[in-house]
């Protein structure tokens, strides 16, 4: 007989600094209410994201009824990557009136390559259009 599939008890989505997960909020309370071993998750997450330090890395944690878990790392949010490329701290409060910075189309394509697996796009050009739209909504102009 094949082994039984684990039954999913919950799905938790978090955005945590790479290599810096600790039991303090927001990680501790989110995992604690599902009965997951918090330190075990923190050690596994920190080891998996060590190479991406400095970025916020979203994670999707699947918690099973026997309190075991596994997690899937996503790519950093497009907004964070755009802010880093533009060299600014935050986007514009009124993006259609006040522009805070500009990025080149090459930078947008580079971000699109990074984000491709998480975007709903068939090729790099479509992904670049999605990223350019995000940039415009943040008050960042796209040159080129």
From Swiss-Prot:
Post-translational modification: One or more lysine residues are methylated.
rRNA-binding recorded as keyword: yes
Gene3D superfamilies for this protein: Ribosomal protein L11, C-terminal domain, Ribosomal protein L11/L12, N-terminal domain
Keyword match Cell division: no
CDD domains associated with the record: Ribosomal_L11
Signal peptide region: none
Gene Ontology cellular component terms for the protein in this record: cytosolic large ribosomal subunit
Domain of life, per lineage: Bacteria
GO terms, molecular function: large ribosomal subunit rRNA binding; structural constituent of ribosome
Keywords: Methylation, Ribonucleoprotein, Ribosomal protein, RNA-binding, rRNA-binding
Biological processes annotated in GO: translation
InterPro entries tied to this protein: Ribosomal_uL11, Ribosomal_uL11_bac-typ, Ribosomal_uL11_C, Ribosomal_uL11_C_sf, Ribosomal_uL11_CS, Ribosomal_uL11_N, Ribosomal_uL11_N_sf
One Pfam short name: Ribosomal_L11_N
Role this protein plays: Forms part of the ribosomal stalk which helps the ribosome interact with GTP-bound translation factors.
HAMAP family linked: Ribosomal_uL11
Similarity annotation: Belongs to the universal ribosomal protein uL11 family.
Subunit and partners: Part of the ribosomal stalk of the 50S ribosomal subunit. Interacts with L10 and the large rRNA to form the base of the stalk. L10 forms an elongated spine to which L12 dimers bind in a sequential fashion forming a multimeric L10(L12)X complex.
Name of the protein described by the UniProt record: Large ribosomal subunit protein uL11
Record gene name: rplK
